[in-house]
Structure formats: C-alpha cells, structure tokens
C-alpha cells in the first residue's frame, strides 16, 4: 500500500516542479530504484514508512521554499512539512536530514525566511513529535541513539577503503546503475547550460537535500561497515531533478533500460531465493570444525527469506513431542507447554519470534550483552524475564555462529531448496 502511495507522491512532486511529463518520469525513476521498489515498497522495514513521510515532507518543503514551477513561496506549508518530517524521524533518524537540507538552503540563499514564524512553527512541530523518542533514549539503557551512534563511531578507527568501496558500489546498485548514469547526465546538462531562476532554486535545494546525507554516510563507511540503504532517501530529490531534465530533453528511451534492469534483478532474485540456481562463491570458513554442515548456507543472504515454513513445522513437531513427554512424566521430562525459545542476538531472534515462535504459540527471549540483544532486552523483561532453571528451547543455525552451553539436542532439521540441503538447524533444550 505504501509503495503505491509513494509512487503517487513522487508523481505529485513531479507535477509540483514541472508538468505531467515530469511527474511521469519521476514516477518511473522512483519505480526503477531497487531501494524504492523493494525495501520501501515490498519489505516491512523502518524505511517503508520513512519513504512515505519523507516524500510527503519534501513536497511541502519545496512548496514552502518556492522551489516549484510557479516559484511562489508558501511558508505556511512548513507546518505540513514539519508534521511529516517529524513522522519521518519517528520512523528512522535519517528523517532529520529533511530539515538539515532545508535549513542549509535557507541559510545560504533565503535568509529572510528565518524571520517567518511558519518556519519555526514547523520546526517546533517536528521536535514535538520526536520529543518522546529523545526522552526515552535519555532515560533508557537500551538507547537506540546509543546503539546507532556506536554503529557509526569512527574515533580511533583506521580508514577502510574496502568498506567505502562497498558503500559506493552498494549505493550504485541499490539506486539502479542506469539511473545513476542518467543522474550524472542530468547534472552535466544543467552545469553546461544556463537555466532559469526557478530551476536554479530547485537545483540548489536538491543538492542540500541530497549531498549532506550521502557525504556523511560515505564518510562513516570509510571507518565502519555501513549499509547502502542508510543514505538511499537522499536519492529521492535527485530523481526529481533528473526527471525535470529528461522531461526538458523529451527523452524516454532510457527508461526501458532502467526498468528493464530492475525487472531482471527482481526476477533473478526471486528465482535465486526459490531455487538457488546461481552458484555463489564460497567464502573463507569462520570455524575449524570437521563438521561439513557447520557453516551450511552461512554466506547466502537469499536464505534470509527462505525455509522458515520448513523450520516452523519441524519445531512444531518437536514441541508437541516434548509437551506430551512433559505431561506423561508429570513434569520430570520434556518441555512445559509454551516454553520460550532462547536467542543470544536480536537477529535472528526477531526472525525466530515471527516465523517460528508465534505460529507455535510461544515467544522468544534473549540473553547476552545489550549491544547484541538491543530491544529484545526490554522485550524479554516484558515477557517475564528468564527465571532460574527455566526450561527453554534453543535453535542453533549453521548460518550463524552463536551457541550456548548446556544444551541437549532434540532434533536436527535440514532446510531443503531444490532438493538440496541449504541450512541446518539443531533444536535443543537448555539443561542449565
């Protein structure tokens, strides 16, 4: 639903800065982005609501600043911009770049706007919306701000060109290589030709809405491992600018290549998830075990989306057997009804929780340091914590290196894809 809404919002943004052709081209560019189509339009991630609120806020930011086809400033739009920017920040912290880009633009090119009360009202509304988040993070040990700050902390770190290279290449792929080429062409076209004043305003605010986010995350990636989708919202305004230039040039053939690339990636990705038809290169083993299945599927990211139904059914069978044994032995053996599953990290704890525990009428609890369990520290406490000698299940996966002591294996489960084993799970119970 939000994916469709986002496409409509991009079309409306195109109309705002140009005409129907600009809106159509902007919608095509948005659809051609793997980040927009898959992460924002298909998956259930923080990026999903972020994308919708980001685009809505950007629409009203452009109206307020007069970066539109009629070049008229409408400062009252800052109220709506602030509302949606606040909602974007509630979805993900990167929503703050909406205000950063706008304020930088106003500081350099439209300082008189700082005297307008609508601007400050919009800023206040955004801050009001994120105040609960700020308060919770300042009073809770499981601070999300602290967690994410640690992920990008670079003091004392040596530059890692490989990490930077992965970030650049990832951004190139997430946002569609064909469209990156179109973007570069649009920038060259603008730079080499004199544009009208309203186009200058659009170009300037696009730069301030995009460059800071991309530059900051590229800088972080020089010292820490980052993910390309962190900076991907910065490309939304860049697609608008590209659409405006392509509409001016009346070019439409490049969209065949752009959408064709996305279609091919989606088709091949779906086939790979379902069949594993593309052989993946083997990475260096992390363990020295002689067990041939110790790291089965470890380096295949497509398995994140495969095999959960098989594991769920296998766990359900083990659960029924253990509960029957518990009942027959008056609690001396087996596992009590509703016994929780123990995990040591928030990932794959969240997967186990949704795909395995919930369908089988139980929950997941975690143990370990806060930086590993994160929000599941609080979730575990809400679920009653872990009691002394509490009987718990543990699921060891060949895809993850985590393990716990004092376990008694109950069953070994192989997930099959295309008649080949791709993951091994060992379902155990904690013996304490």
State what each model feature region is.
Residues 310, 316-319, 323, 362-432:
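Aromatic/acidic, Gly/Pro-rich catalytic loop(s) in extracytoplasmic/lumenal soluble domains
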Residues 49-69, 80, 84-85, 238-241:
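Specific aromatic-rich, kink-prone transmembrane helix
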Residues 87, 98-203, 209-224:
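Transmembrane-lumen/periplasm boundary regions of multi-pass, lipid-linked membrane glycan transferases
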Residues 1-9, 30-33, 50-53, 238:
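Transmembrane alpha-helices of multi-pass, membrane-embedded glycan-processing enzymes
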Residues 41-49:
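Short acidic/glycine- and proline-prone juxtamembrane loop motifs at membrane-interface regions
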Residues 26-32, 85, 89:
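Short helix- or helix-capping micro-motifs
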Residues 248-285:
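Signature aromatic-anchored transmembrane alpha helix within multi-pass, membrane-resident enzymes
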Residues 2-18, 56, 60:
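Transmembrane-helix motifs of polytopic, lipid-linked glycan transferases
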